[in-house]
Every structure is written in structure tokens, then in C-alpha cells.
């Protein structure tokens, strides 16, 4: 046993420096809390062990929300990407999302630079092995070498390191991602403290040398020529982009997999953990979708200064010699040189229904968890949780109100509510279909939804807030102008409408109503009734979306109003569910397990049906717990 010694006192300690840990540490320090971030390896801050990309459906909107709340992921990827594309441009604004290919090394370097320059933040290399708990509250941590750090709150963001094991073929060994040191003692400590842990699994594909790829047999996938950014504050854009490339598996690929399934740890029984449904291994895809003649494979550069190419779509834990054969069966990769083999990794995570919506654990006060330890997959989901946990840990210490985002506020609210209310039996991935109010939770309006909240809690400086208010005023004033001004059916007007393929006007029409026609766009309207100033593309887009989808948005807002009424019906913290007669046994068990804060949250628990909610409402409203709530 190492000699223990007092190493320092902080307000907030963050364990881990991945995507969750980086955001948590930055947020806590930014809010004014004296913060310490401890990581096993300082060279691996914000490392991307799997895909070299940020964003995508739902996830890209989360990155925008992180930026609106004062987080850093969006700013970092804007400075370090090699390609950026807006997805779903042919669909409505609710599902549009930005996706960027990252330069993995530059991304790490930029995040490390930002964190090192953040006031109130100390960064130290060290492995935490034990949490110090006194009277049900966390008071510090102990590292592998015996250093004792005291703190009022602790945020655990251990990713896939908790009792991590890498599996390739019939080989299994203790390891974190990319052959880093795993965290075993801390996993044991969490179990000793009474937390329910589950075993999950994720995987990664092989990487190949780009000099050995025959790109003539693949399809080029360029980035957008239009400047794009995740951060609302980005003003300089990277236009020198690198393409990705598309190819497909072949019948031979599928034959190799089927002939070697007995060597796959997934099918041999070696892997016990549950894998991510929406990111299956190539073995799983071939078995589950055996009617498909081929599967997409994207070749994604890992950076500007490396030969490594990520083979997206070929996640596997088959033996290395089988992986080599798989690669050579894919058009364009016949002579590909594998630089790193794909692998699966199993790890411990906690059952997330053990958390409050603030991400504080119910079992231990002052202890928060964020990222893959909570059962999620993905850098963006991790960063979002880290941001919220870091802000709330700091708020806890500083005597401020903690922030809980509702399902109608943000995708981040959907993510956290799903985790703490429903739990998850597989690595959770955020999807647009999970959000009931997705028309309100768009890529374009993340700042309009969240920046005011961020300013109030100290995550956004005055200068940014003033710029935001100026932008908001421009949008509101122009919408008001378009509602008032009449466009007459003169020749200029009819020519613009005809050019868009629309029906000519018979009478005058308000600018806002003309813009609501599906074929019309703001630029066309403003050419007929110019504004006094030239708006940015961002402002123009907002004006158009708010007016074009006004009817749908109003319907969604009415639904939100109903939700808020249910959210405002609070459930007393110490309610005795056993005392409520008429509740179904399953509902009683689930309510006791999740301990929902409101009727709305209770209604979303799996196994709690409308009849149970009615009984619960009557019980509360009849004043049977007046002495408790009073």
C-alpha cells in the first residue's frame, strides 16, 4: 500500500479527461469553481479511440447545444476538422445536422490548449482508485500513488476504462481503449459503495495505410463548399478540405465472415457485454441482414499528417488474420496494409436510473457521473453529459441553482431524461426519433433556446450575450416587418413568383404570408421589399424557418405547454409509494427505483401506465401527503 498524503483541496474534482471530462472540467472552472481534472495520461486528453468524426443526425444538434451553453466541443472541431457536411439538406429543418471529419491529433492538441489556459482549472496526471465518502457525501479521492485530493463535489467520467478488456479473436486482456491502462480499483470501489454496475461492449474497425488504397475503385465523398461551423462564434472557416471515400463489402466479404463466425468473440460466447444496437459489428450486420448483398464502407482519413484511414462500417473483433482477408475482399482495399486491427472492448457502466436529472448520484451526495459510465455511446452524448455534470457540480458548491434541461429545451434534456427515467439495457445512442419536440430542437436555433440560460448561470460572457440579443432583435424586427408590409401584385412581384414556379397573385399579400408558400424563400421576398440592412445567412434562415413552419411550431408549443403543466406537478421527495393503494406492483417497484421528481417524469417510466398516474395524481391532490409536502 502506498503512503497516503494530502495533495490539495478543490471545489470540484473531475476524474477522466475524455470528451465528458474535458467539458465537465471546463464548465466547472468557467463557473468559478476551483477545479482539478485527473487523468491517467495527459497526452490522451479528448482522444478519439473510435471514429474520427463529430456530429451527425441528432448528435450534431447536441454539439450546437453544447456551444450555446458555453461548452467547447464545437469550437474545437471548427478549428481542427478536415471536412464538414450538412446532412439531410433535402429534408425539413428538424432533421438537418452537421457532421465533421476530425483531425484526431489536432483535436486533442486544441482541447488540451484550451483546458490548460482555462482559469480555475488544474490538470494533473494520476489514476484515481478510491472515492472518499463521509456520512453519505463524497469528500475527495485517493490516487494510485496515495495522493489524497479533497473536494466538495466529484464528477466521474471514466469512459470505457472501468475494468476495460480488449478482445480480438480468442485473445482477451485487461486494457482501456487503444491499449491504455484500465481502471480496475475504481470499478471495485463503486461496486463496494453499492452501485449497480452493468457490462457493456463497443468496438472499432481496422485502420489502413492510405498509400495502399486504390481510390479509383471507390466513390469520392467531398465536404460542403459552403462554409459551415458548429460554434455560433466561429468566424474563420477551413475551406481546404479532404474527401472521404465510399466503397462496399463484396459477396466474398460475407463468405469470409460466415466461414469464420466461430472465431468471432461475439458468437463464441467470449463477449458477455451488450453492444450498441445502432453501431453493429460487420459480423452482426452480415448475420442479421443476410438478405443484403452488400454494406457501405466509408474510408475516412484520421488527419492531415497521418497515413491512417479509418474503415467506417467494418467494426470487428475477428482475429487479425481474418481481418486482413476481409479488407482484401473489399473493392479498393485489395492491397490495403492494415496498420491497426479492429477490436472489441468490454467495460463497466452504472445503471443510470441511480442518478438524479442533475446527474448527481442518489446514493452519494456531491458525486456526479457523466459519459459512457452512464451507459451511453458517442463523443457528443458524453460531452453533453460532462457539460451538465460539470455545471451542476460547480453550482452545488457555489450555492447556485442546478440546471435541468427538459425534453422540450434540448436534445441534451431528452438524453438525460431517457437515461435517468428509463435506463438503458444497451449503449444508448441519441436519435432524432427519441425527441417528441424535434421541430423545436433544431440545429439552427440552439442559441435561441439555450444561450439565455447559459448567461444566467455564468457560462456565457456579457459580450457574447449582447451579440446574441442583437441577433435576436434583428430576427424579431424583420418578422414583425414582414407581417405588416403588403406586397402588391405588380409585374416585378409576378415575375419573381413565376420564376419560383408559383401561382401569380390576384390581390396584395403580406410578406410573411407569401413567404409561407413552399416555393418561396426569404431572398425572393426581400428582393421585392428590401430591408434597411443586410442580414447574415444565419438570420435569414431563422426568419424563413420561423415563418414557414409557424403553424407546426405553434402546435408543438401547445404540446410543450401541456408537458410543463405535468412537469410542474411535483412529487414530494419522501412520498411512500407503499402507502398508495391501487398502484400496480410493477409501477410501485419502478416508481421506488427511479424516484421521479414530477408527474411528467413518472409518466415516462417503463411499466408505469396511465391508470397508475391517475391514482398517483389523486393521492397527491387529495392531500393525503399534506404533512409530508407541507
Curated annotation (Swiss-Prot):
Homodimer. Heterotetramer of two MnmE and two MnmG subunits. It is found in: Cytoplasm. NAD-binding protein involved in the addition of a carboxymethylaminomethyl (cmnm) group at the wobble position (U34) of certain tRNAs, forming tRNA-cmnm(5)s(2)U34. NAD(+) binds at residues 275-289. It comes from Lysinibacillus sphaericus (strain C3-41). Belongs to the MnmG family. InterPro entries: FAD/NAD-bd_sf (IPR036188), GIDA_C_N (IPR049312), MnmG (IPR004416), MnmG-rel (IPR002218), MnmG-rel_CS (IPR020595), MnmG_C (IPR026904), MnmG_C_subdom (IPR047001), MnmG_C_subdom_sf (IPR044920). It comes from the Bacteria. This is tRNA uridine 5-carboxymethylaminomethyl modification enzyme MnmG.
